[in-house]
């Protein structure tokens, strides 16, 4: 039987619902934290981003060295005019890839770049490839990475960035193929300069990723750590993407 409320009772119920919603939002906001670089120890440093005080405490720096561009003929666009000597942190040399159609010249130049940084006295951890591989093509990406791994000296590790929807929509065979060839995946919860809404739901499914992984955070962005992260033996921490301060 339907029940009809009078205007006064309906107003009271409306106020109660509004209070409950406000309380819920307050709890959610209390749980979320703003990512502050000084609270972390691993960072991406892209070209054009000014060094920050937090880098002094860095244990690992993911440094953009170049971009592999070109739809018809791949070529490298260098992002660093010189090879600095970074004292202290481990350094990952990062290449942003628009294409994975690398010829031998491209791969040899990338590997030579790693050796040049190492010869300059830097503690090179390895090579990270930043490529937006689609969830339906991870096996093809893994095949490309296998070729890179075959040429990469054993003293260097191989890492990649990962998209959030890998955990939800990628086929298990593709994920397993990646797990065999790479040492780590850094899963980014942001796109461009914005945190992806609903990232918590994707991260809850990361248990399917049977490879060492980190979470890529955005400096100044929101972050709520799911309980499942700490329970995963494959979770290895965070990498913060640094931004220039807003003017």
Model regions: which residues?
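Bacterial N-terminal signal peptides
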Residues: 15-25
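Secreted glycan hydrolases and related glycan-binding modules that recognize and/or cleave
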Residues: 6-7, 24, 28-247
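N-terminal secretory signal peptides that target proteins for export/translocation
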Residues: 1-10
């Amino acid at each position: 039987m339907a029940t009809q409320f009078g205007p006064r009772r309906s107003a009271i119920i409306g106020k109660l619902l509004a209070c409950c919603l406000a309380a819920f939002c307050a709890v959610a906001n209390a749980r979320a934290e703003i990512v502050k670089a000084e609270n972390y120890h691993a960072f991406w440093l892209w070209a054009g981003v000014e060094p920050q005080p937090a880098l002094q405490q860095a244990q690992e720096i993911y440094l953009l060295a170049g971009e592999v561009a070109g739809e018809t003929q791949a070529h490298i666009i260098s992002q660093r005019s010189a090879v600095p000597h970074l004292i202290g942190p481990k350094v990952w040399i990062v290449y942003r890839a628009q294409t994975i159609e690398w010829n031998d010249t491209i791969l040899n130049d990338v590997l030579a770049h790693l050796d040049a940084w190492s010869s300059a006295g830097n503690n090179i951890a390895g090579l990270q490839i930043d490529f937006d591989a689609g969830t339906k093509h991870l096996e093809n990406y893994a095949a490309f990475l296998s070729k890179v791994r075959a040429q990469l000296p054993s003293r260097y590790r191989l890492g990649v960035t990962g998209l959030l929807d890998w955990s939800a929509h990628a086929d298990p065979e593709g994920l397993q193929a990646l797990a065999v060839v790479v040492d780590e995946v850094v899963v980014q919860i942001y796109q461009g300069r914005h945190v992806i809404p609903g990232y918590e739901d994707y991260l809850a499914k990361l248990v399917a990723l049977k490879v060492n992984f980190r979470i890529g955070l955005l400096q100044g962005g929101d972050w709520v750590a799911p309980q499942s992260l700490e329970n995963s033996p494959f979770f290895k921490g965070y990498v913060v993407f640094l931004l220039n301060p807003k003017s």
